[in-house]
């Protein structure tokens, strides 16, 4: 069974994919925002990146420290099980990247950080708990910045278009179910007549899927899965049934994790009332919260919300 409703599973499985969607900081007009925020920290500052994902914001912090000849103590957490090669790469940059940590239940002491930030991450975590936890992390005089998905942003619109294309290609049939039925029958020794019928049905469904995918592909994210389904549909009997079922499970999870990732973005994209609620949660924890800013990309389109906050210094 695919655990599609488990948010941590969605992200953990998503990072196993060969291809990932990236929120490119420069193209979205975010580089200057992060540069201004991060360059204001003193040498030795402790920083926490929440729901770090691929670590773009944490990497920006490390890069800022290097360019300014400063040392930042950077922690970056995510609820997903992060790829080991990503963790190692970030470690070389001076970032402690830690997976399997829920932003809504942080294992760190109160007021342990000079800076708390997130880029397209914290809005995916449980509300209001994740925002209350973020406030708890910030020491007196500390500053925070959240860059979050906007409901009218170019990212949100792009995700909606991708999902529509994906659903059109997948269509009314389920090639994966047909393939599982076929190879399970092989494994259990189904009758020749049944196997022949199952092979024909599976082969026809794959052919229709290929037509809907088209060339150039209407949904590039489906290309690896369709290529695999085409391969096993040509001569299914050549494949070991147990191995084929294992590969089918992986391919289906690959497709589903991408779809759930896009659906999650649509669900968490924020409007103005959402920002008002977040500001209220942070304020109740003693933070001073600035009015939200709308960040625009290099083309002038809405890219994100930016929310700045700080904990007043002790008198």
Language-model-derived ranges and their functions:
Residues 286, 295-315:
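Core SAM-dependent methyltransferase catalytic element
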Residues 104-116:
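A short acidic, Gly/Pro-enriched loop at the edge of an enzyme's catalytic core
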Residues 145-175:
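Conserved class I S-adenosyl-L-methionine
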Residues 1-42:
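Class I SAM-dependent methyltransferase Rossmann-like catalytic core
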Residues 115-128:
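A short SAM/SAH-binding and catalytic strip from SAM-dependent methyltransferases
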Residues 176-288:
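Substrate-binding/catalytic lobe of Class I Rossmann-like enzymes that use SAM or dcSAM, i.e.
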Residues 46-48, 53-105:
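Class I SAM-dependent methyltransferase SAM/SAH-binding core
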Residues 129-140:
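A short glycine-rich, Lys/Arg-flanked "PGG" loop and its adjoining helix->strand segment in the class I
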């Amino acid at each position: 069974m695919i655990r599609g409703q488990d948010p941590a599973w969605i992200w953990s499985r998503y990072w196993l994919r060969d291809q990932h969607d990236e929120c490119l900081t420069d193209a979205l007009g975010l580089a200057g925002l992060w540069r201004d925020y991060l360059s204001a920290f003193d040498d030795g500052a402790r920083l926490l990146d929440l729901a770090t994902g691929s670590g773009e914001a944490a990497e920006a912090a490390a890069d800022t420290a290097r360019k300014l000849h400063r040392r930042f103590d950077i922690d970056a957490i995510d609820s997903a099980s992060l790829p080991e090669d990503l963790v190692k790469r970030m470690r070389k940059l001076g970032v402690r990247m830690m997976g399997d940590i829920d932003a809504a239940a942080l294992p760190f002491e109160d007021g342990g950080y000079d800076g708390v930030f997130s880029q397209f991450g914290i809005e995916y975590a449980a509300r209001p708990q994740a925002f209350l936890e973020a406030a708890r992390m910030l020491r007196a005089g500390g500053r925070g910045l959240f860059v979050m998905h906007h409901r009218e942003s170019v990212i949100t619109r792009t995700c909606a278009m991708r999902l529509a294309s994906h659903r059109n290609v997948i269509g009314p049939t389920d090639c994966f179910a047909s393939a599982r039925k076929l190879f399970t029958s092989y494994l259990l020794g189904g009758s020749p007549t049944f196997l022949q019928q199952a092979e024909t049905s599976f082969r026809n469904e794959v052919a229709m899927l290929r037509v809907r995918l088209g060339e150039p592909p209407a949904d590039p994210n489906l290309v690896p899965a369709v290529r695999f389904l085409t391969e096993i549909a040509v001569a299914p009997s050549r494949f070991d049934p147990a191995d084929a079922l294992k590969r089918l499970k992986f391919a289906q999870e690959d497709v589903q994790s991408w779809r759930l990732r896009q659906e999650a973005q649509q669900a968490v994209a924020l409007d103005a009332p959402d920002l008002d609620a977040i500001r209220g949660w942070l304020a109740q924890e003693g933070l001073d919260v600035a009015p939200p800013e709308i960040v625009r990309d290099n083309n002038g389109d809405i890219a994100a919300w930016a929310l700045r906050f700080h904990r007043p210094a002790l008198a």
